[in-house]
């Protein structure tokens, strides 16, 4: 049986979104990889192409509109995705003709509300800041952990902050925005460092002003992406913890910007950004699990 999907993106961070309220979806890692593989016109192969696959399941608890699952393009299920969360919130609000919505994920309950035309604000909850919440392989102060890349006496990057936003993040603060090549080389190296038993998303944050961060993120299981919502949240939290930014800041990617607030009253991280609907399609029969 064929299955409909929606192709969406948040600042170019793109998703294949599958509604599973009436038709259950239990894909293998291989099937997720087949969906996420980007088309190659030269070789005449590839799937739909995306950074993550998202399934919107029936709710499992009172007060939620859905239960949402996320997979990285390598086929591994992940706990959270900030840009994907905004896309899901927008879809649920559109279908329910509501201005706000709540839904559950493996990382906990998230909520969203309309902030304008295809602009969504999402409450990402409280960040995990303890070493075993990231998790790290050993106890460390997550404001700045003992990690560096490069020569001991002249490291390229060092002493990053660590934050969990339902998925693990490490954030290096850099004096100037890094190149894609640097982010790929360093990010792929740090992603699988023994300090991170579950792997890690790697951010490179340049503080342009107290209300402005320029960010590039190497995503665990997906590689270098146009934008990363949880990465933006993690960068802002890590920066505030070091006294580098105020509680509200614009986090800028090359593809656009998100507004991130680490709310002092309750410690919740609030993300506001755009949602883009690209197209509707049908999954190939072989991956319509």
From Swiss-Prot:
Q: Where is the active site?
A: 81, 228
Which pathway does it take part in?
Answer: Amino-acid biosynthesis; L-lysine biosynthesis via DAP pathway; DL-2,6-diaminopimelate from LL-2,6-diaminopimelate: step 1/1
Catalytic activity, per the record? Answer: (2S,6S)-2,6-diaminopimelate = meso-2,6-diaminopimelate
Disulfide cysteine pairs (residue numbers):
none
Q: Which is a GO BP term held by this UniProt record?
A: lysine biosynthetic process via diaminopimelate
The EC number(s) attached to this protein equal 5.1.1.7
Which residues of this protein are annotated with the site description Could be important to modulate the pK values of the two catalytic cysteine residues?
169, 219
Keyword Isomerase tagged = yes
Q: Which GO terms describe its molecular function?
A: diaminopimelate epimerase activity
Q: Per the similarity annotation, which family is this?
A: Belongs to the diaminopimelate epimerase family.
Q: What does this protein do?
A: Catalyzes the stereoinversion of LL-2,6-diaminopimelate (L,L-DAP) to meso-diaminopimelate (meso-DAP), a precursor of L-lysine and an essential component of the bacterial peptidoglycan.
Q: How does it assemble?
A: Homodimer.
Per its record, how is this protein called by name?
Answer: Diaminopimelate epimerase
Q: Which organism is it from?
A: Caulobacter sp. (strain K31)
Q: What is the lineage of its organism?
A: Bacteria, Pseudomonadati, Pseudomonadota, Alphaproteobacteria, Caulobacterales
